[in-house]
Amino acid sequence: MKVAVLGAAGGIGQALALLLKTQLPAGSKLSLYDIAPVTPGVAVDLSHIPTAVEVKGFAGEDPTPALEGADVVLISAGVARKPGMDRSDLFNINAGIVRNLVEKCAATCPKALIGIITNPVNTTVAIAAEVLKAAGVYDKNRLFGVTTLDVIRSETFVAEAKGLNVADVKVNVIGGHSGVTILPLLSQIEGVSFSDEEVAALTTRIQNAGTEVVEAKAGGGSATLSMGQAACRFGLSLVRGLQGEANVVECAYVDGGSEHADFFAQPVLLGKNGIEQVLAYGEVSEFEANARDAMLDTLKADITLGVDFVK
């Protein structure tokens, strides 16, 4: 099993690479790429960690050597948020980066499962899809927007608020991956009840958690460590699905035939071909239904921005 991380010298990429080096199945290969010349050194650094995962690093303009034979590609390349920026401000820089990298994936590893981490995910996933379509290799079951950070934040914040063991808390998060498009389905959490005020406050905190980190770091970065953990969880789930493990389910932003938008985050069953089945997200509360309906114009506009960028 070969996993490639594109953007591996960045804050998310290095955290993700460290976690994958320590957690990928024995015998896996981990391939790191970044434009930054430090990248082969990141691989050497990681190679000193005693796990049976082979690491190689590649720098420069062309990611092709890193992508050859990849089963899973995780793309975190791009610029990070700074105070005062929202995820859409990132679009102007990151859109071109994602387009160029996905073009290389289409040429080098067209059957790989691709997880897009680079923000704004609502838009960059649509860009990736259009690039893959133009290359004639698009398979909607092999492209994912990684929204796992919203899930782990939801699980953490709910556990803290209710005094629960976080390992026992499971939260589905639907919609998209920025602001109001992030919708945690708090009404579905078993054995927990929330007041209307708690639901509103928790939902808002989850939606704005990225800003919480950006402001707390005071211009020194964004949510790199928690995003690295979230991306590792999702990447390992992709690997487990590819290896034939049963009942591997994660939420992800996918082209899943949603009635709501061309791309929509919801639970998916993972398997040997990527998405085996898009799962229904179930009954929602009135608050959640209203929030879902209210986000759709924003989500659709984000998607259109990506489609138009490629065309």
From Swiss-Prot:
Coiled-coil ranges per UniProt: none
Active-site residues, record numbering mapped to chain: H177
UniProt keyword terms in alphabetical order: NAD, Oxidoreductase, Tricarboxylic acid cycle
InterPro entries referenced in this protein's UniProt entry, alphabetically: L-lactate/malate_DH (IPR001557), Lactate/malate_DH_C (IPR022383), Lactate/malate_DH_N (IPR001236), Lactate_DH/Glyco_Ohase_4_C (IPR015955), Malate_DH_AS (IPR001252), Malate_DH_type1 (IPR010097), Malate_DH_type1_bac (IPR023958), NAD(P)-bd_dom_sf (IPR036291)
Positions that bind NAD(+): G7, A8, A9, G10, G11, I12, G13, D34, N94, I117, T118, N119, M227
Record: residues binding substrate: R81, R87, N119, R153
Signal sequence, start to end: none
EC number: 1.1.1.37
Reaction(s) the record says it catalyses: (S)-malate + NAD(+) = oxaloacetate + NADH + H(+)
Entries under Gene3D superfamilies matching the protein: Lactate dehydrogenase/glycoside hydrolase, family 4, C-terminal, NAD(P)-binding Rossmann-like Domain
Domain of life assignment: Bacteria
Any GO molecular function: L-malate dehydrogenase (NAD+) activity
Keyword ATP-binding: no
GO cellular component: cytoplasm
Annotated S-S bridges: none
Alphabetical GO biological process terms: malate metabolic process; tricarboxylic acid cycle
Subunit structure: Homodimer.
Cited NCBIfam families: MDH_euk_gproteo
Family: Belongs to the LDH/MDH superfamily. MDH type 1 family.
Its biological purpose: Catalyzes the reversible oxidation of malate to oxaloacetate.
Protein name in UniProt: Malate dehydrogenase
Source organism (scientific name): Shewanella loihica (strain ATCC BAA-1088 / PV-4)
